[in-house]
Amino acid sequence: MIEFLRRIAAHRLAWSLLAASALFLELSALFFQHVLGLHPCVMCVYERIATLGVLTAGLLGMVAPQKWYVRWSALLLWGSSAFWGLKLALKHVDYQVNPSPFNVCEGFVDFPSWAPLDQWIPWMFYPDGDCSEVTWQFLSFSMPQWLVAIFAVYLLVFVVVAIGNLVKGRCCS
């Protein structure tokens, strides 16, 4: 099993599946925004950036997955993006489940001055929605609740693959 996990992270197919899943999420977000007219909020924009981190990790892992430093750079980016995305999605769910004037998201995104993405790419990163408003549901779950599940799966798979690449078994000594 350890050898399988080690081998799977060294193949482009696994990394391309990771990138494809994140690309699907990004394209879905743009569909919801531009076709269905659902405006993204500040937390939605941050969750998009976390998803872009997973997408970038998948693309980086596809470059040269046999090289340990490329593979581990991609793994660390994947894990940190999945963790950050899960943390953001949980906070977003809290805004929706416990609406309060004291529990609200910021009115604007807080990008660094050297990368104002909301000004450079406003069609993707400009927030004009309300974090506490539930505008869409599927199977009685809101979009942030689905993102909690998605980022939790990303994080779980990351942990399994990372452990498989850390542990030295009899097969690999």
Curated annotation (Swiss-Prot):
It comes from the Bacteria. It is found in: Cell inner membrane. One of its GO terms (biological process) is protein folding. GO terms for molecular function: electron transfer activity; protein-disulfide reductase activity. Its main location: membrane. Gene3D superfamilies: DsbB-like. One of its GO terms (cellular component) is plasma membrane. The chain crosses the membrane at residues 15-31, 50-65, 73-90, 146-164. It is a multi-pass membrane protein. Disulfide bonds join 41-44, 105-131. It holds the Pfam family DsbB. Residues 1-14, 66-72, 165-173 are cytoplasmic. HAMAP family: DsbB. Required for disulfide bond formation in some periplasmic proteins. Acts by oxidizing the DsbA protein. Belongs to the DsbB family. This is Disulfide bond formation protein B. It comes from Aeromonas hydrophila subsp. hydrophila (strain ATCC 7966 / DSM 30187 / BCRC 13018 / CCUG 14551 / JCM 1027 / KCTC 2358 / NCIMB 9240 / NCTC 8049).
